[in-house]
Amino acid sequence: MAGFIGKEKHAVDEKGRLMIPARFRRKFPETSGSLASKKEPASLYVMKSPDSSLELYLPDVWEEMARTISALSDFHPDERLLKTLMYESLEMVELDRQGRIPLSREFLDHAGITRDVVIIGADTKMIVWEPGRLSEVLEGSSGRFAALAGRYF
């Protein structure tokens, strides 16, 4: 898998484009896509997260998730709702030659992004936060790291 780690501060330009940090782009698998250089995928999947961030997935990672989602039943109300919520919150975007992705107004508004962002590498995905919202989340959970780590590790 890609193994994204660390964080980078960037800004969305006036056209709503976000530069994917070079160190994250270096983790992308090689591609021959005409819209990207040799080490950049032609596309990423962007999903609105329930915590008001945006999640970025490489196509192979999203396709694995999509197989799980597709296995859900259209005849079970909760499973059908989950499918609807997942796909309603998803867009596929293409990287340009400079390694930027366009973010729609709907997605920028969801995350509260006007300009500055923090991009966090989270193993198989990248998480895009508006800096103020990220600070609120981190400050609100400052004493919980040890408890969470103890519970899950």
UniProtKB/Swiss-Prot annotation:
List GO molecular-function terms, semicolon-separated. DNA-binding transcription factor activity; transcription cis-regulatory region binding
* A GO BP entry: negative regulation of DNA-templated transcription initiation
This protein's UniProt keywords:
Cytoplasm, DNA-binding, Repeat, Transcription, Transcription regulation
Q: Which GO terms describe its cellular component?
A: cytoplasm; nucleoid
How is this protein organized at the quaternary level? Forms oligomers.
Q: Which family does it belong to?
A: Belongs to the MraZ family.
Q: What is this protein's record name?
A: Transcriptional regulator MraZ
From which organism does this entry originate?
Answer: Chlorobium luteolum (strain DSM 273 / BCRC 81028 / 2530) (Pelodictyon luteolum)
Gene name, please? mraZ
